[in-house]
Amino acid sequence: MAAAAEGVPATRREEQPPRDDAAVETAEEAKEPAEADINELCRDMFSKMATYLTGELTATSEDYKLLENMNKLTSLKYLEMKDIAINISRNLKDLNQKYAELQPYLDQINMIEEQVAALEQAAYKLDAYSKKLEAKYKKLEKR
């Protein structure tokens, strides 16, 4: 290294940082595997890739089956809810019909209640008038 440094001008030598030989890695020459090894590795790779893809497809298929089952259950639940809604609607129509049938009687009850209130007011007025008459009668009787 010292011999190589002598051929380089002094300013050039100062610019280069000192090298740490412990940090330098050595590379080995890449050797191609034998043809039989490549064929075996390819077969192994394709086998594992087939296994992987089969697993992925199986998982996807299972997901679709799960979604199908969930859709069927949801459909059944909505059919049940539809039946419940139909029953509620039918019962509500029956109640409305019964209320319509009772409406004349309810109107009569309201009219009777108004008449009773008017009669009660008349009774109070009559009572007040009779007390006035009684007071006048007693007053006239004393004379």
Curated annotation (Swiss-Prot):
GO molecular function, one term: gamma-tubulin binding
Any Pfam family the entry gives: BLOC1_2
Record's GO cellular component terms: axon cytoplasm; BLOC-1 complex; BORC complex; centrosome; cytoplasmic side of lysosomal membrane; cytosol; gamma-tubulin complex; mitochondrion
Superkingdom assignment: Eukaryota
GO BP, sorted A to Z: anterograde axonal transport; anterograde synaptic vesicle transport; extrinsic apoptotic signaling pathway via death domain receptors; lysosome localization; melanosome organization; mitochondrial outer membrane permeabilization; neuron projection development; organelle transport along microtubule
Coiled-coil stretches: 80-128
Keywords carried by this UniProt record: Acetylation, Coiled coil, Cytoplasm, Cytoskeleton, Lysosome, Membrane
Ranges where the record places region Disordered: 1-36
Modification sites for N-acetylalanine: A2
Biased composition (Basic and acidic residues): 11-36
Compartments, record wording: Cytoplasm, Cytoskeleton, Microtubule organizing center, Centrosome; Lysosome membrane
InterPro entries on file: BLOC1_su2
Entry similarity comment: Belongs to the BLOC1S2 family.
Function: Component of the BLOC-1 complex, a complex that is required for normal biogenesis of lysosome-related organelles (LRO), such as platelet dense granules and melanosomes. In concert with the AP-3 complex, the BLOC-1 complex is required to target membrane protein cargos into vesicles assembled at cell bodies for delivery into neurites and nerve terminals. The BLOC-1 complex, in association with SNARE proteins, is also proposed to be involved in neurite extension. As part of the BORC complex may play a role in lysosomes movement and localization at the cell periphery.
Assembly and interaction partners: Component of the biogenesis of lysosome-related organelles complex 1 (BLOC-1) composed of BLOC1S1, BLOC1S2, BLOC1S3, BLOC1S4, BLOC1S5, BLOC1S6, DTNBP1/BLOC1S7 and SNAPIN/BLOC1S8. Octamer composed of one copy each BLOC1S1, BLOC1S2, BLOC1S3, BLOC1S4, BLOC1S5, BLOC1S6, DTNBP1/BLOC1S7 and SNAPIN/BLOC1S8. Interacts directly with BLOC1S1, BLOC1S3, BLOC1S4, BLOC1S5 and SNAPIN. The BLOC-1 complex associates with the AP-3 protein complex and membrane protein cargos. Component of the BLOC-one-related complex (BORC) which is composed of BLOC1S1, BLOC1S2, BORCS5, BORCS6, BORCS7, BORCS8, KXD1 and SNAPIN.
Name of the protein in its database record: Biogenesis of lysosome-related organelles complex 1 subunit 2
Annotated source species: Mus musculus (Mouse)
